[in-house]
């Protein structure tokens, strides 16, 4: 199905403590998906928890541009590289409620930001981040 789709997501790598047990298979499958979809431009959303640099390197190897890094939480150096390569980041209400998320927003060019709710999986102040909550992100920006 992926070879025929214009929208691919959410794909990527999770090198958090929970994800490390499947690191090898994640890397193999991610490389496989990227090699399958690199033939033409597509809208791609990425999961990169604890693996931002590794995900960016995979995109470079496959010549993929303009992907969206969902809830970027990596270093500012990697964030700068993400933008230098032509990619985007998505910002959600939980990010603007944390110091690290605010740093990502501050270092992100406005024309490289997409907003999202990430609901119903995320909460801010004990409230589920539903789509109407993205207004908080717009106000913050």
Q: In which residue ranges do the predicted regions lie?
A:
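Active-site phosphate/pyrophosphate- and oxyanion-stabilizing loops and adjacent acidic/basic residues
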Residues: 102-103, 139
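His/Asp/Glu-enriched short active-site or ligand-binding loop at hydrolase and phosphoryl-transfer sites
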Residues: 84-100
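Short, acidic/turn-prone active-site loops that include or flank metal/cofactor-
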Residues: 73, 93-97, 118-121
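Mid-to-C-terminal alpha-helical segments outside catalytic/metal-binding sites
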Residues: 131-141
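Divalent metal-binding pocket/active-site signature
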Residues: 1-85, 103, 122-132
């Amino acid at each position: 199905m992926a070879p025929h789709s214009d929208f691919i997501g959410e794909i990527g790598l999770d090198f958090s403590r929970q994800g490390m047990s499947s690191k090898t298979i994640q890397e193999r499958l991610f490389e496989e998906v990227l090699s399958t979809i690199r033939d033409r431009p597509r809208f791609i959303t990425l999961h990169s928890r604890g693996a931002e640099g590794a995900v960016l390197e995979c995109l470079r190897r496959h010549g993929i541009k303009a992907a969206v890094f969902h809830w970027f939480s990596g270093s500012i150096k990697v964030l700068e590289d993400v933008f230098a390569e032509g990619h985007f980041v998505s910002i959600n209400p939980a990010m603007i409620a944390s110091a690290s998320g605010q740093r990502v927003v501050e270092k992100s060019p406005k024309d490289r930001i997409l907003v999202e709710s990430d609901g119903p999986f995320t909460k801010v102040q004990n409230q589920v981040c539903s789509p109407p909550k993205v207004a908080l992100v717009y106000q913050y920006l």
